[in-house]
């Protein structure tokens, strides 16, 4: 679907193997570790699937598939406040406040909105880019109006701030979104 990239991995038995039994050119993961949930590779539907568009490495076909199947999917990524960091269809979806580590299990982050926005622009999806830019500007505008400051991340469905009032950092990327909407020069981020 243009969203996932996989690598074949082999898991060895729990016991450490003899060095002679290792196969050349084979990648062994977690040698000697017990098989538990947290040591297994999982395919999760997370926002970083859009990164190939931002990086410019997605083919036009992959980009089209991502936009159609993932960006436009309001049950998965496209929320009223922006892009969810994890699809709510995943079991670990959770928007509770968490500061250590910060919650990347569903809330909307401005840097994520921005990177997806830039990918959309790069591949010519201007209508979708405009939609995401407008959502992001509205989200931060409401936050500043209500609280006099910006927050680190937000609830996807209603835009309520979650944690860290006064957070600026990548929230300022919204200025590039506003400049793009106004057809002004956008500052190069890298």
Protein language model regions, located:
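Extended glycan-interaction surfaces of carbohydrate-active proteins
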Residues: 1-108, 141-190
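An acidic- and aromatic-residue-enriched active-site/binding cleft used to recognize and process polar
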Residues: 9-10, 125, 134
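Alpha-helical support elements that line or immediately flank enzyme active sites
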Residues: 48-60, 113-126
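Inward-facing hydrophobic residues that define packing positions of alpha-helical scaffold repeats
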Residues: 67, 132-133
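Beta-rich accessory regions
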Residues: 121-131, 182-190
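Amphipathic alpha-helical segments of tetratricopeptide repeats
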Residues: 137-138
